From Swiss-Prot:
The gene is rbcL. It is found in: Plastid, Chloroplast. Substrate binds at N104, T154, K158, R276, H308, S360. RuBisCO catalyzes two reactions: the carboxylation of D-ribulose 1,5-bisphosphate, the primary event in carbon dioxide fixation, as well as the oxidative fragmentation of the pentose substrate in the photorespiration process. Both reactions occur simultaneously and in competition at the same active site. It comes from the Eukaryota. The active site is at K156 (proton acceptor), H275 (proton acceptor). SUPFAM superfamilies: RuBisCo, C-terminal domain (SSF51649), RuBisCO, large subunit, small (N-terminal) domain (SSF54966). GO terms for molecular function: magnesium ion binding; monooxygenase activity; ribulose-bisphosphate carboxylase activity. The basic functional RuBisCO is composed of a large chain homodimer in a 'head-to-tail' conformation. In form I RuBisCO this homodimer is arranged in a barrel-like tetramer with the small subunits forming a tetrameric 'cap' on each end of the 'barrel'. Belongs to the RuBisCO large chain family. Type I subfamily. It comes from Euglena viridis (Cercaria viridis). This is Ribulose bisphosphate carboxylase large chain. It catalyses: 2 (2R)-3-phosphoglycerate + 2 H(+) = D-ribulose 1,5-bisphosphate + CO2 + H2O; D-ribulose 1,5-bisphosphate + O2 = 2-phosphoglycolate + (2R)-3-phosphoglycerate + 2 H(+).
Amino acid sequence: YRLTYYTPDYQVAETDILAAFRMTPQPGVPAEECGAAVAAESSTGTWTTVWTDGLTQLDKYKGRCYDLEPVPGESNQYIAYVAYPIDLFEEGSVTNLLTSIVGNVFGFKALRSLRLEDLRIPPAYAKTFWGPPHGIQVERDKLNKYGRPLLGCTIKPKLGLSAKYYGRAVYECLRGGLDFTKDDENVNSQAFMRWRDRFLFCAEAIYKAQSETGEVKGHYLNATGGTVEEMYKRANYAAQIGVPIIMHDYITGGFTANTSLSMFCRDNGLLLHIHRAMHAVIDRQRNHGIHFRVLAKTLRMSGGDHLHSGTVVGKLEGEREVTLGFVDLMRDPYIEKDRSRGIYFTQDWCGMGGVMPVASGGIHVWHMPALTEIFGDDACLQFGGGTLGHPWGNAPGAVANRVASEACVQARNEGRDLSREGGDVIREACKWSPEL
């Protein structure tokens, strides 16, 4: 492999798709051979020379390992940079992109472990994707909500409630001041609550809360189904009853289904909330798998208006920088290379719409100053127990979330430092809100 696929003097073309792999070779295997093997197995190579190689231009189509750098602090680990010609990939297909780059190479014997850290999608390829159904700005226009983060709540217990009680919990949260409520990722259409019943009771809750508050409200109705046809049926029903947003589990549902659903949402004026169920199976190991920033990039190409991104709060400082790196990749039009934040390549999205990051998981009102400072306005803060765990009930919990959020936004706009004064801001707001 090394003679053909390791080319350290290669000049990267503007149209090349670039990948950064963290690889650990088996003992005794040279890093150059491993890097070349990764490039070969994820492009034109096979384990032996075949006579049909002479019938094509390998130089035009092969992937090339053009750089290797040792990972600081690790004894036998390298970042291998691989360039793929754009002609290897079908236009507008995330499925084909991932099948080619990570489909086959991860079981390779010469490697102890392999992790895809980042991808550079060139403008020529990015332009073949539709991207999010609507994007952040259109979502704000639809909701008529500006200048603050959006607030949401996942209804708990996630399994076991009847549709009627589920709808009641939705109404109480929306009535209290939240913008959205959410189906949990594993709420589909089980015996205790069929999807059509849930859709109807949630729609009733949305309309009732809207008429009482004068604000646009929504509930992420999970349209994920066992078949694509079933998914379309649920999405179509949601559009018919007039709700503003639906939801999809994009990793378990698959990229092909997600791209199709995204197109449907664009055509029918629905926002699309994306849940990342199963992501940790792929991205949790430090040395093997795919980093979440790659999954976030591919979701932006496939299509989704919201994507769960983790919370940052309470995590380690370095992890905070990395999380903010892929949050920027989700919502900014142009991102500079910055290795301190885990961004290996400069990424230009060519005007593709942004995905709103959703911070969820164990957050409550005391986290609000930090969340407001870290994520800014273009984010959705998704509570669960932080709303429903209020001792007075769901609606007071929602009021507490909304008051805390607006207090933090006002304090920030007045020039106060939320990282230092956040606790004081919340305590001052408590004087005006018994719920908080």
